[in-house]
Amino acid sequence: MNVLGIETTCDETAAAIVAAAEDGRGVIRANEVLSQIAEHAAYGGVVPEIAARAHVEVLDRLIARALHETGLVFDDLDGIAVAAGPGLIGGVLVGLVTAKTLALVTRKPLLAVNHLEAHALTARLTEGIGFPYLLLLASGGHTQLVAVKGVGEYLRLGTTIDDAIGEAFDKVAKLLGLAYPGGPEVERAAETGNPERFALPRPMLGRREPNFSLSGLKTALRLEAERIAPLTNQDVADLCASFQAAIVDVVVDRVRGALRAFGDVAGHPTALVAAGGVAANGALRRALTQLAGEAGLPLVAPPLPLCGDNGAMIAWAGLERLRLGLIDDITAPARPRWPFAEALPATAG
């Protein structure tokens, strides 16, 4: 079984082909990703119109490259999977229209995948883990703690009430004059910084509900930066290290709370899974590895190339859905907003 996956929800254009092995695990046969960082760097963030146009220019070539790399033709495919949202509507439409056209011409099943669900299922592609598991989904636009009970069965235990973790990293980087994208730049600067120089707040620590709030932390860093301006390179490094340490402390505390809540709604987890672009942060991975070990669980995080947006995760999510007969109609809509997990009932936990 081979599925083509198409990803165009933000600033990566991607096409991949994933197959199912005999043991049920996924095999990435091709994974083509073209980043638009250079196109957006001058603006300090993603410009939706530029992103959509860039997808149009390269998507067909990436699909052709994926097929060429595998030696497959369209007749060899069992399905066409595409990220139908959430994301920037212009980009989502580019991928969705392309996928619908291919599905019509080749008469292959269309699999309209939720981009967030694809992140949630990536650990099954790379490690073959079973359900249920606790997912920390942390990216530029989303921060959620989710009980993943099965394909299509997702219960949100906690979320951010303001900024997503990746968004906070990007805003701090911009405030400190670092390059775009901000997350890797903050992590790089933090390597030579003193994480104890600035006593930044740890919002929501100890709260029963495992939600996040990062706007206050971001404001506190801005006030410290203004207080000591003009900033030296060491000041920037120390601010980044202090900010990253605060984020890690908050995440560990919130995940610990989610682990407590998990048992009441989904039983014993098979693993703690970290997914999304922020899961590439080394300090966060180390802290989560320690936390998972204390809980007697493995930490499962995708290889770094699969933390960010990619076509392989879309293809795999499509393949998981295809095996369950969850095929979409050709009229499937583009969905710029598309929650993928139900909220935890107030009576649970």
Curated annotation (Swiss-Prot):
It is an enzyme of class 2 (transferase). Fe cation binds at H115, H119, D309. Its cofactor is Fe(2+). Its main location: cytoplasm. Its EC number is 2.3.1.234. Substrate binds at L137, A138, S139, G140, G141, D170, G183, N281. One of its GO terms (biological process) is tRNA threonylcarbamoyladenosine modification. It is found in: Cytoplasm. One of its GO terms (cellular component) is cytoplasm. It catalyses: L-threonylcarbamoyladenylate + adenosine(37) in tRNA = N(6)-L-threonylcarbamoyladenosine(37) in tRNA + AMP + H(+). The keyword Transport does not apply. InterPro entries: ATPase_NBD, Gcp-like_dom, KAE1/TsaD, TsaD. The keyword Lipid metabolism does not apply. Keywords: Acyltransferase, Cytoplasm, Iron, Metal-binding, Transferase, tRNA processing. Binds 1 Fe(2+) ion per subunit. GO terms for molecular function: iron ion binding; N(6)-L-threonylcarbamoyladenine synthase activity. Belongs to the KAE1 / TsaD family. HAMAP family: TsaD. Required for the formation of a threonylcarbamoyl group on adenosine at position 37 (t(6)A37) in tRNAs that read codons beginning with adenine. Is involved in the transfer of the threonylcarbamoyl moiety of threonylcarbamoyl-AMP (TC-AMP) to the N6 group of A37, together with TsaE and TsaB. TsaD likely plays a direct catalytic role in this reaction. NCBIfam families: gcp_kae1 (TIGR00329), T6A_TsaD_YgjD (TIGR03723). This is tRNA N6-adenosine threonylcarbamoyltransferase. It comes from Methylobacterium nodulans (strain LMG 21967 / CNCM I-2342 / ORS 2060).
